[in-house]
Amino acid sequence: MIEHMFESRWVTCADLAAFSEDLRTLGTGAAGAAELIDQIRRLEELKSAAAAAQARLTVRFAATQRLAQRAAGVPAREIGKGVGAQVALARRDSPARGAQHLGLAEALTRELPHTLAALEKGHISEWRATLIARETACLSVEHRRAVDAELAANPGGIAALGNRAVAAEARRIAYRLDPHAVTDRARKAESERCVTLRPARARHHGVAGGVAARRPRRCRLRGAVPARRRPARAG
């Protein structure tokens, strides 16, 4: 199983590099159809376990960087600056996405323990974990953890729900726990929409209208970040 791959010993970068090299041999042998499909499944589980490990490492890296910045006398308002960009660079991603990677990692490790556990075991994908984080981002920490626990308590756990279903269920529970936060999010998202006009194709001799967001929905942008530190409201 994924969790026993390195026999609980400390895994080094050299170990990971060697394992990556081993993966290059997959698909070159004479495996039968059953073995091939099993390998595909195991690799999917490995991707999820790797995403969970990245989350844990990201949070630890961020903590060490903030500590070093404080020790260096960096002004309080600047603490943490540049951390997300370094994470994005390590992931070969745009620096602009660094804050999202960092936010998701902090949410999973601090506020969504059941979701993180499912990811570690390869039961859900990183995208499904992101959906849960996104749909609960407007809640208090207490309510966010409650949604996480309730999703995990479903028959079959979080893994039994597809992407759409898990997002809808998380949204439903969130609304039950704090309808004000959910309606505020919807209202804010609606206010950030705008109507645009663009020239239609020549054969239509007119203009075409459409609805577009001025910018990504704020709550969706924040969807991977830790919940706001505010007292939980009564439902």
Residue ranges and their predicted role:
Residues 1-235:
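Conserved C-terminal region and hinge/linker of Rieske [2Fe-2S] proteins, especially
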